[in-house]
Amino acid sequence: MPKPVLVIGGGIAGIQAALDLADQGIQVYLVEKTPSIGGKMMQLDKTFPTLDCSACILTPKMVAVARHPNIKLLTYSEVIEVTGSAGNFNVKILKKPRYVDEEKCIGCGICFNKCPSKVPDEFNLGMSQRRAIYVPFPQAVPLKATIDKEHCIYFTKQRCRVCEKVCPTKAINYEQKPETIELNVASIVVATGYQLIDPTLAAQYGYGKYQNVYISLEFERLLSSTGPTGGEIVRRSDNKHPKNIAFIQCVCSRDVKINPNCSAFCCMASVKHSILAKEHLPNVDCTIFYMDLRAFGKGYQEFYNRAMREFGVKFMRGKPAKIEEEPETKNLIITYEDTFTGLKKTMTFDMVVLAVGVKPIYPEALKLPLSEDGYVQLKNQYLDPVLTMIDGVYTVGVAAGAKDIPDSVVQSGNAAIKASILAGGAQK
């Protein structure tokens, strides 16, 4: 009988690792700190270079995780302590209270349609609102409501309780307490993903100051039919379609003052955004400002060529120095140096999208050594890029270095094989 394996992180990398392990007959505990699995990929409209629907790829895998007999899903939970060694890790997990009985909740949505408390929606990066009781997105797994205690009127003012009154299954439980779960596992797969670097650190671009400056993930949500505008690209300032859009690369990346690392997927993400913008608005002009364009993956160079030749996307080699706003029109004036001519130039755009760099998230409870670049230290990043400095702990996805979805999924399979060996091997 194989021993269990712990997977930390419910994004695409963690999901794939969990499925690969579970299909070998190994019991998997998949821990995700948010109310639903899915991760950043769930926020994407389409994937590059094929422009396949992101949710169409991911949601079947999310459902497969929930239904797999060998996977125990622990959402809204965090690993708080790890002791022991390879083959015999003792793990403590804190399961936070949803204040909703998961066994009773049927995900009907009546509670959050009636809730009077409105909060900026994290899934849409604050561009829309959710209620104090909510599910993160319609395809959430598990499709169970969660009460945001900090914004719930009952918890903050001791009144309301509307959700309790309207719930048809009596699932609301304001007395729910945190729960500590203790596990013994053979190995651990770290798939904790990344967070975006604060774009206001690049103050010269005016993010948060100028309404029509967006970050790439915000633009992704604008493109999505499930996003705050229903898939319509409109400006924050006047709700009008932009006539021209600038995409600026390497914001908070390859910058010695903020983050010297390349974030790997930003170049192709911006190429994708420019193509999708042209599909949504055929007459829009798209210009990508870049230092070096890195099209290293399968089909990436062809994707870049397609953007230029088929869609007429312009590529301007030169990193903008600053952005200024025209007060009346809210248009944005970009000052940059054209590195091919050496001339200082300005261009005016209706909308600017910043390709912001990323930094890893890693579980502090594991006390994993970090490399100089801030990612999890690997034993040998060239020969085996999943082995950490702690035997029995493997890392996949962006936790060990910035990478795209295909590379993350490949790593997950690698880590699953190694984790299964410590667990006792595949069982039918």
Task: Identify the residue ranges that each predicted region occupies.
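Residues forming the flavin
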Residues: M1-K428
